Design a protein with these regions (language model features):
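Beta-rich nucleic-acid/ligand-interaction surfaces
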Residues: 66-78, 178-186
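Active-site-proximal loop/short-helix segments
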Residues: 75-76, 82, 129
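Internal, well-ordered alpha-helical segments in soluble enzyme and binding-protein domains
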Residues: 46, 68-71, 88-91, 103, ...
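Acidic, His- and aromatic-enriched active-site or binding-groove loops in soluble protein domains
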Residues: 80-108
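Positively charged, Gly/Ser-enriched RNA/tRNA-binding surfaces
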Residues: 1-60, 107-192
Length: 192
């Protein structure tokens, strides 16, 4: 099999979690993966596919929120917190449903972070401003960390490609709060 290998499907999938309101064990997922390349072009193509699929199925008022896990991983690396990454990511993944104080507390209790470390990570993950302002701030904070800097560069390339493709800026937004708590997320992350 040659690479990059691309796989697409829509099918029932299952998750190994306890079912709860709005989170079923079985659900239908549209999945497409590119395996065997480290090129940022694959992530940009994924974004274009998401955008085009949303239009094809009739949605016109939607947002694709993006982030890059290399940024958070780089920040954890800078603060010597890589061994606590699972606890930090689980806490950050609750930002939409929990208060910032609760997320900070969980990072401290479950990840062993200091108050200052937890606050710094939360500040980075809830950055506000234009896409360019946020990326500039991230780049400054991650200076000297190759992984985090690469994540910022990948997002800059992605947003440049979005602009060149004529996709309205309000449809693709940088959301640094998207963390995804699973280790198989390694690069660009998308949510609609």
């Amino acid at each position: 099999m040659g690479t990059p290998f691309k796989r697409y499907h829509i099918a029932p999938v299952w998750r190994g979690e306890n079912p709860q309101a709005g989170r079923y064990r079985e659900f239908v997922q549209c999945d497409f993966d590119t395996i065997g390349t480290k090129s940022n072009a694959a992530d940009i193509e994924t974004l274009f596919i998401i955008h085009d699929l949303m239009l094809k199925i009739g949605f016109t008022d939607f947002k694709i929120r993006v982030n890059n896990r290399m940024i958070l991983n780089g920040l954890l690396q800078l603060h010597n917190l890589e061994s606590q990454s699972a606890a930090v990511l689980r806490a950050l993944d609750k930002l939409a449903k929990s208060s910032p104080e609760a997320v900070i507390q969980e990072m401290q209790e479950q990840g062993g972070l200091t108050q200052q470390q937890a606050e710094q990570i939360l500040a980075l993950m809830t950055a506000q401003g234009t896409t360019a302002e946020i990326l500039d701030s991230l780049e400054s904070q991650l200076k000297g960390n190759e992984r985090g800097t690469q994540g910022v560069l990948n997002l800059r390339e992605l947003f440049t490609a979005v602009e060149r493709a004529g996709i309205p800026a309000e449809r693709v937004v940088l959301d640094t709060s998207i963390a995804r708590g699973l280790d198989y997320y390694t690069g660009t992350i998308y949510e609609t």
